Regions:
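Catalytic, metal-anchored helix/loop core of enzyme active sites in primary metabolism
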Residues: 1-333
Length: 333
């Protein structure tokens, strides 16, 4: 109601919601979501989680709209084919993840040729937990993120740092980067979301409090033209800003994610799809927290010992490899 939305697509329709949404055109079937996009549509926010919206985002990139992208999994799965498709059809993808939204605005300020990009991670709930305790991490512990309030899946991804590994891959595809041009560091205060390092030795950074209203509002307004309700950042409230290298023994998903990025092709999709499955098993108590990344690596080796890695996969290639994973997933006892 606040933004006078005319059409709305939802994945699950609940009776109580229907009563509230009578004045809107509501679409509940994902396959019909494209009905919300007509000539009068200016901006589409794509917030379907995981790979459920893979077909839809492929269609949306063909219709020349501005897309606020709150789904990294689809970008990672289709890779540069998606960004090329958007560019070909004059669609604009604006990432809504705080890190990639920061990069988007920093690069649009056009300070000249850049050398590399750094995104930050808070370190999640286990930044200081002894490594010997990782086998005993409970679901409740893993869901307790120190900074962000999120759903279960993304909270687990943040705890394992799979989320950051996926964001590294996403940045490569969104901004057409070489593998050597993107990395991540730990920044516990989560005030700096990304930094762009230029060839002249200058580094620019975007700082704001961790609040998703900031990247979302920037989708609808010029970056400095909208005053939202986020409290102004006062650096004097912080005694220090910390930065640490990522320990891959603590966060093996970062190392695995970088290896997957270098391999390319179907590997990033397989890494992501395996993670979705393995996180669901952890939430059900079937596997341990430390198994999430370990089993991902084991299954990746199995997948590409049995299947050819297609370097420029289309939607059918992705669906086929995901079906193979469903049938042949390895879970150790």
């Amino acid at each position: 109601e606040e933004f006078d939305v005319k059409k709305l697509g939802i994945n699950k329709r609940i009776k109580s919601e229907i009563k509230k949404l009578k004045k809107y055109h509501v679409y509940e079937d994902i396959s019909s979501f494209s009905n919300i996009c007509d000539k009068k549509t200016d901006v589409i926010i794509f917030a379907i989680s995981g790979l459920a919206g893979l077909d839809l985002i492929h269609k949306l990139c063909k219709i020349g709209k501005t897309i606020g992208m709150a789904n990294k999994e689809c970008i990672i799965s289709i890779g540069q084919n998606l960004t090329k498709l958007a560019k070909k059809n004059c669609s604009i993808i604006v990432p809504l993840d705080s890190e990639h939204n920061s990069i988007y605005h920093l690069l649009n300020n056009n300070h000249g040729p850049f050398e590399s990009i750094t995104i930050t991670a808070s370190g999640g709930p286990f930044r200081k937990l002894p490594l010997k305790s990782f086998n005993n991490i409970s679901v409740k512990q893993a869901l307790s993120h120190p900074i962000w309030k999120m759903g279960k899946k993304i909270s687990i991804d943040s705890a394992t740092m799979v989320n950051k590994a996926l964001e590294i891959i996403e940045a490569k595809y969104l901004f057409n980067l070489k593998d050597s041009q993107i990395d991540a560091i730990i920044h516990p205060q989560a005030l700096i979301h990304a930094m762009v390092n230029y060839k002249n030795g200058v580094t620019t950074a975007l700082l704001n409090k961790p609040d998703m209203r900031i990247p979302i509002s920037s989708l609808f307004f010029k970056f400095n033209d909208y005053a939202n309700k986020t409290k102004e950042l006062n650096l004097l409230e912080y005694s220090k800003l910390e930065f640490h290298a990522i320990n891959t023994k603590r966060y093996p998903a970062i190392k695995l994610g970088k290896e997957v990025m270098k391999i390319g092709g179907l590997a990033p999709n397989a890494f992501n799809y395996l993670n979705e499955i393995l996180v669901s098993y952890f939430l059900k108590g079937v596997i341990k927290f430390s198994d999430i990344t370990a089993l991902n690596e084991i299954n990746l080796e199995k997948i590409f010992s049995k299947n050819t890695n297609i370097m420029s996969p289309n939607l059918m290639d992705i669906k086929n490899i995901n079906k193979w994973i469903d049938k042949n997933l390895y879970l150790r006892n």
